[in-house]
Curated annotation (Swiss-Prot):
Its EC number is 2.4.2.18. It is an enzyme of class 2 (transferase). Binds 2 magnesium ions per monomer. SUPFAM superfamilies: Nucleoside phosphorylase/phosphoribosyltransferase catalytic domain, Nucleoside phosphorylase/phosphoribosyltransferase N-terminal domain. Mg(2+) 1 binds at residues 123, 257. 5-phospho-alpha-D-ribose 1-diphosphate binds at residues 111, 114-115, 119, 121-124, 139-147, 151. It comes from Cupriavidus pinatubonensis (strain JMP 134 / LMG 1197) (Cupriavidus necator (strain JMP 134)). This is Anthranilate phosphoribosyltransferase. Catalyzes the transfer of the phosphoribosyl group of 5-phosphorylribose-1-pyrophosphate (PRPP) to anthranilate to yield N-(5'-phosphoribosyl)-anthranilate (PRA). Anthranilate 2 binds at residue 197. Disulfide bonds: none annotated. It holds the Pfam family Glycos_trans_3N. Its cofactor is Mg(2+).
Length: 369
């Protein structure tokens, strides 16, 4: 593990500003026109103003033309950590919540997507392994947009009923240690934004809000991101949102996972402090292996590769799932370190417990049909 020097920001093309300017005074409200002007002038929209603005956008109180202009303006001027935090707070307000009483070792495993790697659903496979090893998982996901197979697609292929109410998701977590929250069901207000995003056809702030807005409010998270600059940004957003233990990762081969094919950048929030470092497969006794063999064409192929990994079939799928599930176990505070987590993940796979966890979860979701 190599600690990174984060004092000097790197120059990047990603449309996000890493540091927010703190206001001396903030207005409670801001008009759409004022917000757009602020973006054009490359000035920050402060926290309370962003709360007001996002509530208007989510409730369709701003015209589609103006909403699109503001979303574009935010991207061009570069969104700040404060703006992202406020926007995520509003999305959480509008979400259909999942109540979970036992929150010990409770974690979300999620990625932003958009990395263009077209690999099988590594984080989805990892959640079964992590749950079998003692974590409780609240996974928040959707159908594939940039990927060949989103988490919802592969879960359906595996026989999971993804159309559960928040109450039913909570019951699944209590019964199996796993809950899957299908984004359209839990974020109904997004229907007002979806047509705007579709017509725009470019990345906006909403592309990075999904992983920040878990309806079960999991206090711990393993989050993969599509760009290296997002590592430091998202972990600091999680800090503002009150996360307990967060690991934000970016594989330097472009994966929004902990990678076997390259070093992985990590931003970790623990005990209220953030640190950034780099890890390598060799740190954990793993060989560096190209991720090319992990690519799939659709959910059917992703399902097959996921079952290989859970079935303890030797190969790259099993290795990368062990690596990511182990990291999730560390994020969930089940394991004392990533290395300890990998050991626990391997045991869960080799014993058959991970595959049994998948079968149990499928049965639990089917009871609600």
């Amino acid at each position: 593990m190599r600690l990174l020097d984060t004092a000097t920001p790197s120059v990047s093309s990603i449309p996000i500003a890493p540091h927010a300017t703190q206001p001396t005074e903030t207005a409670m409200t801001i008009t759409a026109q004022e917000a757009l002007t602020r973006c054009i002038e490359h000035r920050e929209i402060f926290h309370d103003e962003m709360l007001h603005l996002m509530r208007q956008i989510m409730q369709a109180q701003i015209s589609p033309v103006m909403a699109a202009a503001i979303l574009t303006g935010l991207r061009v001027k570069k969104e700040t950590i404060g703006e992202i935090s406020a926007a995520a707070q509003v999305m959480r307000e509008f979400a259909n919540k999942v109540e979970v009483t036992d929150r010990e070792n409770f974690v979300d495993i999620v990625g932003t997507g958009g990395d263009g790697s077209h690999t099988f659903n590594i984080s989805t496979a990892s959640m079964f392994v992590a749950a079998a090893a003692g974590a409780k998982i609240a996974k928040h996901g959707n159908r594939g947009v940039s990927s060949k197979s989103g988490s919802a697609d592969v879960l359906e292929a595996l026989g999971v009923n993804i159309m559960l109410t928040p109450e039913q998701v909570g019951q699944c977590i209590a019964q199996t240690g796993i809950g899957f929250m299908f984004a359209p069901t839990h974020h109904p207000a997004m229907k007002n934004v979806a047509p705007i995003r579709k017509e725009m056809g470019v990345r906006t702030i909403f592309n990075i809000l999904g992983p920040l807005t878990n309806p079960a409010d999991a206090p711990n998270i393993l989050m993969g991101v599509f760009h290296p600059d997002l590592v430091g940004i998202q972990v600091r957003v999680m800090q503002r949102l009150g996360a307990k233990h967060a690991l934000v990762v970016y594989g330097k081969d472009g994966m929004d996972e902990v990678s076997l094919g390259a070093a992985t950048l990590v931003g970790e929030l623990k005990d209220g402090e953030v640190r950034e470092y780099e890890i390598h497969p060799e740190d954990f006794g793993l060989s560096m292996i190209s991720n090319r063999g992990l690519k799939v064409a659709d959910a059917v192929e992703s399902k097959a590769m996921l079952l290989e990994a859970l079935g303890n079939v030797p190969g790259t799928p099993r290795e990368i799932v062990s690596l990511n599930a182990g990291t999730a176990l560390y994020a969930a505070n089940v394991a004392d370190s990533i290395e300890d987590g990998i050991r626990r993940a391997r045991e869960a796979i080799a014993s058959g417990a991970a595959r049994e966890k998948l079968d149990h979860f499928v049965r639990a979701t089917q009871q609600f049909k």
